[in-house]
């Protein structure tokens, strides 16, 4: 296991400085003795499913909070995210006629990369410089909680364990029963066209499920298909905290696995070829993600793949593109061509993150971050189109969302939220997230695009859906 410590000889980007190193050592010793949060068997099952995604035989839906808080570890919020993910996956399955691999940004997504180690805040009318909030597993949001506290790593472990245990119990208890499309409400949809389209898709899904029951696959019956009642659901997070990841990495007869989550990803700030994070990632057998943004050079991307996946194992690396709606057309084709010209052409999974490149200040309050739904849809649609034009395949989408309805953090969508609505229910402590309704908008859009391509008319009815969703940021556009 000495090899898993090899990252210590490299530069650590986004490193956290703990004033009390002895305290940190004691906490890491405790964590080293605790069981892994997931198992190597579960991770290998996900590796098999990722290989099918790389072959075009499945679709990846990876979604959840930007950064979890410990307070999110409660039945209401876990249920909300879990139910939304299951609902979105059912909608995509209907259009794509492909299995959907569900991966949550949950049960460990506590750390938060920052561009600066400190930030300025106003206290009693005066501006003070304090340590930046780095996520609940590092420090707190209160000014008196900004010193990194090793005990928060233990709290992160136990909150992750409780969240994961609750998810497993809910799925085992029938939460994933897929027989509810007729109960879906589309009252939030202001566009008559979109409401009609969403209701049409829901009716079609209901008809399909009625057919399944009619041929003897009724849940609970002798011929029941287990897939109608239970599903696989995997966990993921950005592996920022290498000390934490290392003590939860274990050697088993199958190999070396990071048992903090089923899959982890490299952020745009920690993917240096000669850095500690890449060194750690290349040692573990988990499937891994790599954020690919505007600063990534095509040859650098191929070098990174050579380092992380020297055997070109199918599905081992997911490339999570995040350019921004105004840059994707310029940057994505070159990255696709570089990968297609390499030995990794058939091994990678391409996944679109239409969130991180589209964060902007609110016009009404520049201190508040938001995202325009039109930008999110534009980047996602462009990614689908560019991959098709380049002879590649978009294998999934990576979204920041909350299962809570009525949250107002992103502007637009079928609810036609305006900038003025942000103050109504803006709750994030990190980046703005899609709410329940906006998340369904995305699911319906992707489902329709994949359905049209499956039926051989990729530029027909889905164009109207993309157009209406993209312009729905501006309520005045309706009816033009």
Regions found by a protein language model. Give the residues of each.
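Short N-terminal secondary-structure initiator segments
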Residues: 1-8, 46-76, 294-306
């Amino acid at each position: 296991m000495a090899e898993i410590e090899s990252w210590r000889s490299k530069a650590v980007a986004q490193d956290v400085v703990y004033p009390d190193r002895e305290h940190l050592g004691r906490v890491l010793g405790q964590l080293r003795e605790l069981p892994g949060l997931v198992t190597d068997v579960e991770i290998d099952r996900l590796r098999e499913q990722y290989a099918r995604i790389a072959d075009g035989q499945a679709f990846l839906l990876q979604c959840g909070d930007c950064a979890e808080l410990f307070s999110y570890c409660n039945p209401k919020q876990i249920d909300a995210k879990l139910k939304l993910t299951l609902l979105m996956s059912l909608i995509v399955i209907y259009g794509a006629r492909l299995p959907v691999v569900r991966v949550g940004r949950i049960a460990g997504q506590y750390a938060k990369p920052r561009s600066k180690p400190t930030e300025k805040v106003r206290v009693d009318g005066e501006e003070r410089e304090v340590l930046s909030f780095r996520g609940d597993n590092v420090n707190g949001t209160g000014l008196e909680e900004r010193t990194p506290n090793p005990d928060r790593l233990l709290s992160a472990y136990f909150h992750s364990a409780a969240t994961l245990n609750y998810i497993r119990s809910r799925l085992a208890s029938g939460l994933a029963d897929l027989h509810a499309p007729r109960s879906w409400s589309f009252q939030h949809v202001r566009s008559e066209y979109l409401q009609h389209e969403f209701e049409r898709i829901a009716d079609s899904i209901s008809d399909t499920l009625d057919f399944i029951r009619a041929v003897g696959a009724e849940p609970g019956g002798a011929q029941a298909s287990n897939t109608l009642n239970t599903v696989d659901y995997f966990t993921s997070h950005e592996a920022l905290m290498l000390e934490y990841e290392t003590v939860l990495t274990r050697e088993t007869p199958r190999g070396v696995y990071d048992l903090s989550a089923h899959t982890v990803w490299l952020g745009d700030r920690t993917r240096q070829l000669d850095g500690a994070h890449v060194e750690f990632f290349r040692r573990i057998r988990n499937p891994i993600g790599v954020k690919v943004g505007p600063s990534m050079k095509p040859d650098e991307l191929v070098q990174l793949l050579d380092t992380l996946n020297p055997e070109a194992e199918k599905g081992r690396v997911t490339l999570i593109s995040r350019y921004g709606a105004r840059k994707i057309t310029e940057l994505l084709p070159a990255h696709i061509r570089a990968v297609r010209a390499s030995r990794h052409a058939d091994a990678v999974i391409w996944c679109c993150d239409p969130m991180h490149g589209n964060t902007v200040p609110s016009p009404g309050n520049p201190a508040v971050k938001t995202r325009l739904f039109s930008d999110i849809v534009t980047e996602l649609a462009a990614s689908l189109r560019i991959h098709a034009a380049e002879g590649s395949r978009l294998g999934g989408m990576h979204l920041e969302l909350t299962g809570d309805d009525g949250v107002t953090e992103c502007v637009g969508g079928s609810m036609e939220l305006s900038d003025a609505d942000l103050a109504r229910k803006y709750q994030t402590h990190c980046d703005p997230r899609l709410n329940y309704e906006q998340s369904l908008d995305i699911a319906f859009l992707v489902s329709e695009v994949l359905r049209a391509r499956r039926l051989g008319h990729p530029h027909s009815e889905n164009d109207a859906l993309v157009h209406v969703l993209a312009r729905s940021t501006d309520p005045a556009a309706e009816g033009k």
